[in-house]
Amino acid sequence: MNTRLEKFYKENVVPALMKEFGYTNPMEVPKLVKVTLNMGVGEAASNKKILENAVADMSKISGQKPVVTKSRVSVASFKIRDGWPIGCKTTLRRAKMYEFLDRLINISLPRVRDFRGVSGRSFDGRGNFNMGVKEQIIFPEIDFDAVDAIRGMDIAVTTTAKTDAEAKALLAAFKFPFRN
């Protein structure tokens, strides 16, 4: 079963990118590999309930249970010790990845206050895109009244593109709202 965005990729994005970059084979066209969501919750060291709420929020947003991340080293200034839970992350692939990106592009990003588009310079040099979200309440799955605290998250989109130009063209073909 193909999602709406996956069908759009096969019917519209692949032919457009083949024409733009001169690919001879459809398998050469860059594609999305995975979307990784990460939520760092530094306050979780002092209060375990905060981490439980963050995990619940992320599981609603992603549709799957996130993994709790633990600190690797003790840092006295942050008051954390080695092995303490300090965040959560989840990796979306295939259908869940396309469904999440569809919701992100068409529903969540337009709900951001004073939104002018995502930065076109957030590529890592190898064709992957990273962005941050300041509030988890932009996602429709989160009930605004039930939120205990406003938390942000990192979103990393991994592609098979070899250059940033190919990756930007791929995401722009998916109607990603780039600022520049």
UniProtKB/Swiss-Prot annotation:
It comes from the Bacteria. GO terms for biological process: translation. GO terms for molecular function: rRNA binding; structural constituent of ribosome; tRNA binding. The keyword Ribonucleoprotein applies. Keywords: Ribonucleoprotein, Ribosomal protein, RNA-binding, rRNA-binding, tRNA-binding. The keyword Chloroplast does not apply. InterPro entries: Ribosomal_uL5 (IPR002132), Ribosomal_uL5_bac-type (IPR020930), Ribosomal_uL5_C (IPR031309), Ribosomal_uL5_CS (IPR020929), Ribosomal_uL5_dom_sf (IPR022803), Ribosomal_uL5_N (IPR031310). Gene3D superfamilies: 3.30.1440.10. This is one of the proteins that bind and probably mediate the attachment of the 5S RNA into the large ribosomal subunit, where it forms part of the central protuberance. In the 70S ribosome it contacts protein S13 of the 30S subunit (bridge B1b), connecting the 2 subunits; this bridge is implicated in subunit movement. Contacts the P site tRNA; the 5S rRNA and some of its associated proteins might help stabilize positioning of ribosome-bound tRNAs. Belongs to the universal ribosomal protein uL5 family. This is Large ribosomal subunit protein uL5. It comes from Xanthomonas oryzae pv. oryzae (strain KACC10331 / KXO85).
